[in-house]
């Protein structure tokens, strides 16, 4: 059986070659994280079979499959590998890419991947471009896996080498999906292994974000570089797959029925893919906001004529979601005729993630309403949840104001120098923090998944000076922080209404 030597821990990993020649031992590498500690060998069969799961752009799938499947059949025959591809339109969440699972020897995995990479590169440049990110999808800009990854200075690395996978042509990228345990081996202790991979290959290697408080089953490795650089990096990554007994634990090629969060295909931004599986139904999004409708809110200031294409689809998807859980579109002041509204809702059916679009639409509404000065008067109707408006007003004596924002006063807002990141701090009464956290912290996790923002709450007993309020810090892009702030505000408003209707719950 083919095996690979682990990198020994000697305190100086950077620059240590990764041996591709098979030694006689399968001893576990010391840099493996705790969750990779199991010795159960599930990645290989009796014939030294391993698994490699990669993403293939939909535009390149046809050339890989060939007419009537002839190309892929011939490829399997020549390499001895088994190749499975997700069905047409069955894309990896948040992308238009199909999932390909390759099973075979190490040589077969490398050969098949080399063929796939070549086919992707052969596509015309006007087709093989980086997937666009919707302006309605909030993204954070956190350094992947909190590892300070600088492009290594190496004879194989030049200024022309890709330094940012988000701006690199898809033709020069490789995307590999690995179990969380394998991701730990690829990173290594303190990031030593991934740095060694970059130094030896000249490629840029990044992993999708590792979330706090919840474990993803898989993570996505993005390799960016010239063909030979990528080939070398993939060989080194396959070596780590070879070393991990759990590397064959996630062999699904369809994510249509996967429950729970799925790793983002991009190395920056939220750890989670922009997928309906994170929040599978409109009802789930409604639950985050509380049971309500938007009756009586101020007119929505957006002008739909300013949007086209995918943006319009995302917006109409949001409208569809809003309508599905009782929001009255006529009260939004969108200026849509009955016929236009019907058409918009029909178009929304094609959306992959209407729940997230709805949250962003609400965030946009909150932003626009605030900019127009509608919150200046502190009236309950501005952000009131319709039927809860009166109940919210009834709590004014307890919280000190009519606006739900008063229960989450803004302490301060900071922007990064390039304007790509905001940090918003708000104060929330101690007895309302539980509404934001949810049972076992579930609500807080869902808010972060939905918006892409990072939300932190000060520890119990740590209050804003002179108050009994806890500090909530929201970090992310302007869109992400706005969406998260709005969700928190609406949740607090809902809780206020519930407590006003049931005074025994207060305190």
Curated annotation (Swiss-Prot):
Alphabetically, the GO molecular function entries are: mRNA 3'-UTR binding; mRNA binding; RNA binding; sequence-specific mRNA binding
- Transmembrane ranges, per UniProt, are none
Instruction: Write out the annotated subcellular location.
Output: Nucleus
Stretches of Low complexity bias are at 150-169
Gene Ontology cellular-component terms for this entry are:
cytoplasm; intracellular membrane-bounded organelle; nucleolus; nucleoplasm; nucleus
Per the record's keyword annotation, is Mitochondrion included, yes or no? no
List the SUPFAM superfamilies. Eukaryotic type KH-domain (KH-domain type I)
Q: Where is this motif: Bipartite nuclear localization signal?
A: 27-43
**Keyword Transcription regulation, does the record have it?**
no
- Which segments carry the region annotation Required for RNA binding? 419-503
Annotated KH domain residues:
49-116, 171-237, 421-488
Tissue expression summary = Expressed in cerebellum, brain stem, hippocampus, and frontal cortex.
Q: Which residues carry this modification: Phosphoserine?
A: 154
Q: Which UniProt keywords apply?
A: mRNA processing, mRNA splicing, Neurogenesis, Nucleus, Phosphoprotein, Repeat, RNA-binding
Which top-rank group of organisms is this from? Answer: Eukaryota
Annotated region (Disordered), positions in chain: 1-44, 139-171
What else the UniProt entry mentions is: Target antigen in a human paraneoplastic motor disorder, paraneoplastic opsoclonus-myoclonus ataxia (POMA). POMA antibodies block NOVAl RNA binding.
Q: What does this protein do?
A: Functions to regulate alternative splicing in neurons by binding pre-mRNA in a sequence-specific manner to activate exon inclusion or exclusion. It binds specifically to the sequences 5'-YCAY-3' and regulates splicing in only a subset of regulated exons. Binding to an exonic 5'-YCAY-3' cluster changes the protein complexes assembled on pre-mRNA, blocking U1 snRNP binding and exon inclusion, whereas binding to an intronic 5'-YCAY-3' cluster enhances spliceosome assembly and exon inclusion.
PANTHER family named among the record's database cross-references: KH DOMAIN CONTAINING RNA BINDING PROTEIN (PTHR10288)
The protein in question is named RNA-binding protein Nova-1
Q: Which source organism does the UniProt entry give?
A: Homo sapiens
Q: Which gene encodes it?
A: NOVA1
